[in-house]
Regions:
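Beta1-alpha1 glycine-rich phosphate/pyrophosphate-binding loop at the start
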Residues: 2-72
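FAD-binding core/adjacent interface of flavoenzyme oxidoreductases
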Residues: 1-7, 72-146
């Protein structure tokens, strides 16, 4: 980047696998200023949530070990994207301006309503909070209980 030129502002919404990888890739260019927006302060290894629920692995990893020092982490939730104004509104009331936007919010698991009792008794493992819920339940189950 030359003298008075301002860096392009890149906002990445979503700090999962795709968002963290995109932020790290884009930051390698010296003409980009990268902001990563994620509702959690830690990266969640979704493929390890079953181990987290069983108490064998901590699936939450600090972003300081995953993203470059020059990536700004904003722990917040994007609530609105204004493509004309090139802004992202956050749940906190803050607004981020961008030149480029990467939308990498990932996926979520759902419990089918067509399965009787699933909503009340199933423990899905698609999200960190779900793994925490199952871990708490498993901690209450005696070791002798059948599973």
């Amino acid at each position: 980047m030359t003298g008075n030129q301002k860096p392009n502002r890149v906002v990445v919404i979503g700090g999962g696998y795709a968002g963290a990888l995109a932020a790290n890739h884009v930051r390698m260019r010296d003409d980009m200023a990268v902001t990563l927006v994620n509702p959690r302060p830690k990266f969640v290894e979704r493929i390890r949530l079953h181990q987290h629920a069983a108490g064998n692995y901590d699936a939450a990893i600090g972003y300081d070990s995953l993203i470059g020092d020059d990536v700004r982490l904003v722990v917040d939730t994007a609530t609105r994207i204004d493509a004309v104004a090139r802004t992202v509104e956050l749940a906190s009331g803050d607004t981020l301006d961008y030149d480029y936007l990467i939308y990498a919010v990932g996926s979520t698991g759902t419990i089918p309503a067509s399965v009787p009792g699933a909503a009340e008794f199933a423990y899905p493992l698609a999200e960190f909070e779900q793994a925490e819920r199952l871990a708490a339940r498993l901690a209450d189950v005696p070791l002798s209980a059948p599973m």
